[in-house]
């Protein structure tokens, strides 16, 4: 974040500065806090399914993390295009983006080489774009509440059937007891996905390793980009 501010002070183009300070830097701050909350609410040592509200907190922060991860790359692209007065040359606002050919052909060699690597290409296409697009436009990212063995699944179904049989009978204490037992069954799920119908495009990913890896990627790219963004091709 501080590096974005420092680099913005070296230029006098207000629109470019805004994308660094109020765009990328602000997003990085949100990502840092979201990452912290994910690990606070859902420690790796968790051995019981999370309560529903806690799981929602984790999902909210996962959503914030992923949408801003995508946005950081967009903000860097805008800062670069505006700094070098390339908006018309790239074809207008819809062609601004670190992963869009019209913008990439003007990037410094070091930045382009990094983005064009096999690792980054796969990361962007199979993960970042897929999961961000689903989150923004289709199905939000989801952490299943628990994993059940066959026996646990059968017990859960028995309890659920009894709950339905009590509907309208005002037996609230029994309903609460059934719900409490259901919540205690199973083990936590440490994966996330979006759609259940999109196959490989929504393959389950390990939550904690993924957000750590993403954080490393955006920090690494940020240092590389800010070291070279005064150059253009």
Model-inferred region functions:
Residues 1-33, 37, 47-60, 77-233:
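Acidic, Ser/Thr/Gly/Pro-rich intrinsically disordered interaction regions
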């Amino acid at each position: 974040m501080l590096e974005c501010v420092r680099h913005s002070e070296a230029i006098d183009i207000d629109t470019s500065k805004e994308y660094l300070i109020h765009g990328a830097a602000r997003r990085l701050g949100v990502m840092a806090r979201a990452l912290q909350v994910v690990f606070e609410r859902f420690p790796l040592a968790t051995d019981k399914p999370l309560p529903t509200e806690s799981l929602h907190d984790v999902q909210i922060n996962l959503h914030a993390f992923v949408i801003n991860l995508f946005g950081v790359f967009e903000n860097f692209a805008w800062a670069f295009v505006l700094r070098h007065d390339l908006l018309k040359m790239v074809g207008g606002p819809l062609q601004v983006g670190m992963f869009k050919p019209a913008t990439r052909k003007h990037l410094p060699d070091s930045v382009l080489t990094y983005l064009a690597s096999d690792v980054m290409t796969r990361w962007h296409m199979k993960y970042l774009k897929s999961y961000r697009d689903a989150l923004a436009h289709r199905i939000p990212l989801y952490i299943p509440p628990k994993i059940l063995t066959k026996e646990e699944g059968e017990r859960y179904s028995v309890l659920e059937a009894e709950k339905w049989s009590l509907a309208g009978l005002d037996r609230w204490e029994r309903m609460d007891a059934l719900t409490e037992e259901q919540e205690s069954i199973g083990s936590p799920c440490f994966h996330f996905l979006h759609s259940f119908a999109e196959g490989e495009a929504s393959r389950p990913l390990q939550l904690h390793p993924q957000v750590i890896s993403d954080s490393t990627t955006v920090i690494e790219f940020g240092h590389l980009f800010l070291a070279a963004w005064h150059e253009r091709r």
